[in-house]
Amino acid sequence: MVTKRTLASRALTAVIVLAAGVVLGACGGDSNSSAVDSDDVEFVQGMIPHHQQAVEMSELALDGRAGAAIQELARRIQAAQDPEIVAMRGILSRWGIEEDEHAMHHSPDDAKKMGMLTEAQMSELAMMSGAEFDQRWIQSMIMHHEGAVEMAEAALEGGVDEEVLAIATDIKSVQLAEIAELRALLNG
C-alpha cells in the first residue's frame, strides 16, 4: 500500500539522485573534449621535460661533485620538481593527451629561449667538479629557472585550467626565490 509518507520518500529520493547526477556531471564531463586550452597543453607539455632537465642537473650536484650549499639547493629543487612532474603527467592523462617527449626539442633556439641546456652543455657540466662545477651549475640553473618563469608567466596569461594555473603560480614564485638564492651564491 502506497501512503503519503512513501510518496514523499520516493520524491525526496528522486530529487537527491537527480541533484547528485547534476553535480557529478558538472564535475566530470568529457576530459578529452576540445575544451582543453592550447596554452595549458603547451605549458604542461613543455614544463615536463624542462623540469626533468632541472632534476638531472640536481642529480649531478648530488653525486659528490658540488659544494654543500649547492647540494642543499639541488635537493630542494629535486624535491619540488619531481612531484610537479607527476602532477603534470596526471593532468595530461586527465585530458587524454600523450606526453610529448620532444616538446622542448623543436629547435635549439626554442630550447635555449626556455633556458634548456643542450646535450653538449649537460655533458660538459657532468665532466666538472668542485668550484668549477658549482659556478657553472649556478649559472646554468639561473638561466634554466628564468626560462621556467617565462613559461609560467605565459601560462598565467593564457591558460584556463585551475590546476595548471596553480602549478604555474607555484613555479613562478618558487623559482624566482631560487634565482635570488642562486645569484647570492654566485656573488658570495
Predicted features and spans:
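Bacterial N-terminal signal peptides that target proteins for export
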Residues: 2-15
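C-terminal motif of bacterial Sec signal peptides marking the signal peptidase cleavage site
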Residues: 23-26
